[in-house]
Regions:
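N-terminal charged segments
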Residues: 1, 6-64, 169, 173-188, ...
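Acyltransferase donor/substrate-recognition loop-hinge adjacent to the catalytic core
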Residues: 1-7, 110-174, 292
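Conserved donor-binding loop and adjoining core beta-sheet/short helix segment
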Residues: 17, 31-87, 200-226
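Alpha-helical membrane-targeting segments
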Residues: 60-68, 203, 279-295
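Non-catalytic accessory segments adjacent to catalytic cores
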Residues: 84-120
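Aromatic (often tryptophan-rich) hydrophobic motifs at membrane interfaces
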Residues: 89, 192-288
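Short catalytic-loop micro-motif centered on adjacent basic/acidic residues
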Residues: 102, 152, 250-254
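Short, conserved active-site entrance elements at the starts or edges of catalytic domains
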Residues: 154-206
Length: 295
């Protein structure tokens, strides 16, 4: 029932149709996003594209490994509904036939066995007034204290890119930072990005960078000049984004397992949505690679 299709064998019209109609639909599984991030990618398919599972691949030691790229938070199995039985078949096929370093399923995938999980916080589309009732007292206070700040939706321009280069802290490797900046410009070209700013007297305090697929905003980065932290620009900007967008967009914080960030996300009344992951250490991957070579 499950077949692996190499990239050149994929019927992309059927693949994209399955993703668009799926109950697990997200931005990360779109063809153009995977084409940008992946060295190469294949898929597993159930019957005639009733369910699909993208496989991002990278090559190390002359061997291809499955590993999810940066900013592709949740891939997994996509279809007309979620079936733990079908999900198990995909997982068993994957484990038996592929070398896996890191693979993240989506929050809509459920299994009959225990897997590790990572955290995401998510706010479903609805009224801002109802959502604000769920804000923590501390977050409401921080928003109230953020007086005098100016909120704007802006374009991704050279000033914003320079601000990101100076203050973005989420990535330690320079090559990853460059890829992130390239990704932002790629999304800009596809009209799939929303950029918002909080400033005081024309001076930037915080910039929010979000992927936008027409249904959900995905928080790629919240970039701040830390010397203005006491002005609470991050609380202010998220609140403004929710006010302007929540009636027609879901909002995904894209994380986080980091405690301080988790508390921040949760304080806006966001729902915890765990997604299953398979991850092996580099040592485990190397051992498996050597076993395959010797077998």
């Amino acid at each position: 029932m499950i077949r692996r299709l190499n990239h050149h064998e994929i019927d992309f019209e059927k693949y994209s149709g399955c993703i668009e109609k799926s109950v697990q639909k997200n931005m990360y599984a779109r063809r153009e996003i995977l084409d940008f991030w992946c060295e190469s990618w294949d898929i597993l398919v159930w019957k005639d594209y009733e369910y699909v599972m993208p496989l991002p691949l990278t090559k190390k030691f002359s061997q291809k490994f499955v590993t999810c790229p940066i900013f592709c938070q949740q891939l997994g199995i996509f279809g007309k509904n979620d079936s733990s039985e079908i999900n198990e078949r995909f997982l068993s096929y994957m484990q038996a036939n592929l070398d896996i370093y890191l693979y993240s399923f989506n929050a809509g995938n459920h299994f009959q066995r225990d897997l590790s999980f990572r955290k995401n916080y998510f706010i479903p589309c609805g009224t801002y007034a109802d959502q604000k009732k769920k804000f923590s007292k501390g977050r409401k206070s921080a928003i109230k204290s953020a007086t005098g700040l100016d909120f704007q939706q802006i374009t991704l321009n050279s000033v914003i890119l320079e601000f990101i280069k100076r203050f973005y802290k989420g990535l330690s490797k320079e090559k990853d930072k460059k890829m992130m900046l390239d990704y932002l410009q790629f999304l800009h070209g596809k009209e799939m990005i929303k950029v918002c700013s909080a400033s005081l007297n024309g001076e930037l305090r915080t910039v929010a960078l979000m992927g936008d697929d027409g249904e959900t905003l995905y928080l790629i980065g919240l970039v701040s000049d830390e010397k203005f932290r006491n002005e609470n620009p991050t609380s202010f900007i998220i609140d403004q984004i929710l006010q302007d967008n929540l009636e027609n967009r879901n909002f995904s914080f894209m994380g986080s397992n980091v405690r301080n960030i988790e508390i921040f996300n949760k304080s806006f009344g966001a729902e915890l949505m765990k997604y299953p992951v398979i991850q092996h250490s580099k040592k485990e991957v190397l051992i498996q690679f050597l076993k395959n070579k010797l077998s």
